[in-house]
Amino acid sequence: MEGPQELLSGKLRLCFTPAARTSLLLLKLNDAALRALQECHRQQVRPVIAFQGNRGYLRLPGPHWSCLFSFIVSQCGQEGPGGPGLDLVCQCPGRSGPNRLHCLGPLRERLTIWAAMDSIPAPSSLQRHNRTEDARDRESWQNVGDYPEADTISQSQMGLEEVPDPLASSQGQSLPGSSREHMAQWEVRNQTLLPNRDPDQALPPSASQKHVDKKRPAPAAMVELKQKRLRTLAPSPLQGLPSQDLQEEDWEQEDKDEDMGPRLEHSPSVQADSESLSPEEVPDYLLQYRAIHSAEQQHAYEQDFETDYAEYRILHARVAAASQRFIELAAEMNNVQRGTPEHKALEEKIVQEYKKFRKRYPGYREEKRRCEYLHQKLSHIKGLILEFEEKNRGS
């Protein structure tokens, strides 16, 4: 991760010395991922990586923090079928001299780590984080989906090796790779509580907290965060997008998908509506997750919740970051009178930016639908767990 010590100039000799049985990847990552990797190297801890097809997760563990990134592997450096690729060349000091370079092998694939990072810091870490860090440029959403059309399949669930608990708090250590955007997402999620419940009213401890080490008391902050993780879901990142102002065909078609209602929470009306649907229209999670009747069933539901929640948070961060620019433009349109030249110019600007956005982020629709699906599924599971705990507390 260190740059060259001196500039290369003059005539250079290139030697081909590829390493045997070694695959080389071109790594593309943002500053947050780089800082987290550097911190892992400094702490001498090994990152955990999980592949499934061309996608995967990268977890960077630390003593009191944990960062979770998503990535995709794609072809790199080719101008077309059979076109020239990229080679990894290094300058090795020694008897060969400074003007001798060594080619270690071709770079056929690129591993891109998304700028949208999923991390779970403790509240004390958030309060002590350096607030002078520059905010991400508003145009950075264009780099969120830089991958080919063939890689637009939705993310599927995948297992990861065990890493230290990301909810463990630290009173004096900030989270490497965090930013104000992630702190804002954390605050929004913590402020989104269940309906008909006082924000200050604590939920009953769930079965997942029974597995806390009984040899020492669990920190109050960790228990509270585990409760919030079960009881709160971030509001849909798709709310606030315009739904009727634009007349362009491409944007109108997307608006039909963007016109989402308020976020779904567990309620009797939701279950009543689902019962009137045909079997083909009923979501699979309504058939799979019925009322809970035992502690073992509750524990299984909680495990499924945690598994889907990790994927949901990554997708939510990506979709929210991609949608934020259009939410800002829609807010500008609301402040301009319809029919005026300013309104038409702004409308044209949104259409053009949207067309460029579709090319840069071809998998946006699929990830958006997957994010909404997980949001509704997690809300359903959460409601069943709370309903079971409420029933047991009253008996």
Curated annotation (Swiss-Prot):
Compositional bias per record (Polar residues), positions renumbered to this chain: 168-177, 268-277
Gene3D superfamilies referenced in this protein's UniProt entry, alphabetically: 6.10.140.340
UniProt entry tagged with the keyword Nucleus: yes
Keyword Electron transport: no
Entry keywords, A to Z: Nucleus, Transcription, Transcription regulation
Biased segments, Acidic residues type: 246-258
Entry's Gene Ontology molecular function annotations: cis-regulatory region sequence-specific DNA binding
GO cellular component: nucleus; transcription elongation factor complex
Chain spans, region Disordered: 124-149, 163-182, 194-218, 233-279
Residue ranges annotated for the OCEL domain, each copy included: 283-393
Annotated compartments: Nucleus
Quaternary structure, from the entry: Interacts with AFF4. Component of the super elongation complex (SEC), at least composed of EAF1, EAF2, CDK9, MLLT3/AF9, AFF (AFF1 or AFF4), the P-TEFb complex and ELL (ELL, ELL2 or ELL3). Component of the little elongation complex (LEC), at least composed of ELL (ELL, ELL2 or ELL3), ZC3H8, ICE1 and ICE2.
Function of the molecule: Enhancer-binding elongation factor that specifically binds enhancers in embryonic stem cells (ES cells), marks them, and is required for their future activation during stem cell specification. Elongation factor component of the super elongation complex (SEC), a complex required to increase the catalytic rate of RNA polymerase II transcription by suppressing transient pausing by the polymerase at multiple sites along the DNA. Component of the little elongation complex (LEC), a complex required to regulate small nuclear RNA (snRNA) gene transcription by RNA polymerase II and III.
Similarity section: Belongs to the ELL/occludin family.
Protein name per Swiss-Prot or TrEMBL: RNA polymerase II elongation factor ELL3
Annotated organism of origin: Bos taurus
Recorded name of the encoding gene: ELL3
